[in-house]
Amino acid sequence: MENTFKLLFETIEERKRNPLPESYTNYLFSKGEDKILKKIGEECTEVIIASKNNDKEELVKEMVDVLYHCFVLLAEKNIPLEDIMEEVTERNGKLSRVGDRREIDTL
């Protein structure tokens, strides 16, 4: 799975370095950070709706869209995927105490 994410991220970085006409990724880069952030927000909303509708297939698709747009944002901000992977590795296995976290209000 890590390799799949790496390949996707490398493709996104390649589009940033060498734009292809008609590429959606290049469209996002050309519109800039605000457009990328807007798309992340839209896709996160679609994740919420799919989850509330108990639509597993749609939820998976929308999660992929969120990941893709987050990868575009990382590339836009020149943050390598390795930085994310290192942070995940560092957090993996850490014990987190519920009391250390702020309360989440229910809907």
Curated annotation (Swiss-Prot):
GO cellular component, one term: cytoplasm
Metabolic or biological pathway, per its Swiss-Prot or TrEMBL entry: Amino-acid biosynthesis; L-histidine biosynthesis; L-histidine from 5-phospho-alpha-D-ribose 1-diphosphate: step 2/9
Pfam families (alphabetical): PRA-PH
GO biological process: L-histidine biosynthetic process
Entry keywords, A to Z: Amino-acid biosynthesis, ATP-binding, Cytoplasm, Histidine biosynthesis, Hydrolase, Nucleotide-binding
EC numbers for this chain: 3.6.1.31
Reactions catalysed: 1-(5-phospho-beta-D-ribosyl)-ATP + H2O = 1-(5-phospho-beta-D-ribosyl)-5'-AMP + diphosphate + H(+)
Predominant localisation class: cytoplasm
Superkingdom of origin organism: Bacteria
Cell compartments where the protein resides: Cytoplasm
GO MF term set: ATP binding; phosphoribosyl-ATP diphosphatase activity
Enzyme class: hydrolase
Matches recorded under NCBIfam families: histidine_hisI, PRK00400.1-3
Family: Belongs to the PRA-PH family.
HAMAP family cross-referenced by the UniProt entry: HisE
Protein name: Phosphoribosyl-ATP pyrophosphatase
Source organism of the structure: Bacillus anthracis
Name of the coding gene: hisE
